Amino acid sequence: METAGKVIKCKAAVAWEPGKPLSIEEVEVAPPNAHEVRIKLFATGVCHTDAYTLSGSDPEGLFPVILGHEGAGTVESVGEGVTKFKPGDTVIPLYVPQCGECKFCKNPKTNLCQKIRITQGQGLLPDKTSRFTCKGKQVFHFMGTSTFSEYTVVADISLAKVNEKAPMDKVCLLGCGISTGYGAALNTAKVEPGSTCAVFGLGAVGLAVIMGCKVAGATRIIGIDLNPAKFETAKEFGATEFVNPKDHSKPIQEVLVEMTDGGVDYSFECIGNVQIMRAALEACHKGWGESVIIGVAGAGQEISTRPFQLVTGRVWKGTAFGGWKSVESVPKLVEDYMSKKLKVDEFVTHTLPFEKINEGFELMHAGKSIRTVLTF
């Protein structure tokens, strides 16, 4: 492409400081260095994790920054030494990379590649620099992806090449929310046929958990949320019954234990609230119940329960990106979507032009959207 090797000026949503709306700015995006890829984005989702960092609650939050981590686009140019991508490839950036070489990648028990973890947490690319500038200032990267920009640069291990026929305004969501919830049920909990599951929080991740539980053959899938408007939607994804904690005077874990003859086989916390994490564990059946933490809690918050809960056979687990080894799994998830094995379209409640990004955040905070997709 004629832009290869040159700085590209484009639109991006810059977070200048925590707690303030994003600002649409013209930014400069430098060409990719060795083992980096520059991408032209076509669509990006708006996720709670972006809002969490923007709020100032994230201990790793840095400003100014270009947020966003649910994107899809095409390769514009590649840096030196990049062999797996070429200009024009359809790609999804990955906030959990897969180098294939570190001890984490070589261990089948985890998907948490550590190759670039330190620099990613510092808002930089692996060579400890940023490719973004705005108004003469360096702007930080976010989660190694920064999809709230028309162009972004990512490490070549933080990218999946996917089916070029896939609609980018849908499959961008496989970069985070849907994959996270779906994999939590299939990979982390390994939900068994005939089981009873409880899902706390019926946003995009919770709905994806429900979808995973259904695919795994669970017979009872109980959705728990304070917003009854979400129940009808959850039913479409496979939930069989619902509980609104506001309708009960006793703690939610007691309600669930009574409903399920001693507790659920699997529970999932999709909110990021440490009190709910405890309730989700204590709603599990003695002897074999498993609770999976997916939600991200605020900086410095801690979980607690009585050790007896664990001594008597309950298991507490956590998961990131649904346990999927990203580079190899995301293309397969796209194929599952293309062959109608995986719902994605149903998660998209709003599609807005990129300039209306702050409206996307407002819809999410108001509980009016499952996922808003922004198109460039």
Curated annotation (Swiss-Prot):
The record marks 117 as: Important for FDH activity and activation by fatty acids. One of its GO terms (cellular component) is cytosol. Zn(2+) 1 binds at residues 47, 69, 176. GO terms for molecular function: alcohol dehydrogenase (NAD+) activity; S-(hydroxymethyl)glutathione dehydrogenase (NAD+) activity; S-(hydroxymethyl)glutathione dehydrogenase (NADP+) activity; S-nitrosoglutathione reductase (NADH) activity; zinc ion binding. InterPro entries: ADH-like_C (IPR013149), ADH-like_N (IPR013154), ADH_3 (IPR014183), ADH_Zn_CS (IPR002328), GroES-like_sf (IPR011032), NAD(P)-bd_dom_sf (IPR036291). GO terms for biological process: formaldehyde catabolic process. Its EC number is 1.1.1.1, 1.1.1.-, 1.1.1.284. It is found in: Cytoplasm. CDD domains: alcohol_DH_class_III. The keyword Transport does not apply. Keywords: Cytoplasm, Metal-binding, NAD, Oxidoreductase, Zinc. Zn(2+) 2 binds at residues 99, 102, 105, 113. It catalyses: a primary alcohol + NAD(+) = an aldehyde + NADH + H(+); a secondary alcohol + NAD(+) = a ketone + NADH + H(+); S-(hydroxymethyl)glutathione + NADP(+) = S-formylglutathione + NADPH + H(+); S-(hydroxymethyl)glutathione + NAD(+) = S-formylglutathione + NADH + H(+). Its main location: cytoplasm. Expressed in the skeletal muscle, heart, gill filaments and liver, with highest levels in the kidney. Homodimer. Belongs to the zinc-containing alcohol dehydrogenase family. Class-III subfamily. Class-III ADH is remarkably ineffective in oxidizing ethanol, but it readily catalyzes the oxidation of long-chain primary alcohols and the oxidation of S-(hydroxymethyl) glutathione. Also acts as a S-nitroso-glutathione reductase by catalyzing the NADH-dependent reduction of S-nitrosoglutathione, thereby regulating protein S-nitrosylation. This is Alcohol dehydrogenase class-3. It comes from Sparus aurata (Gilthead sea bream).
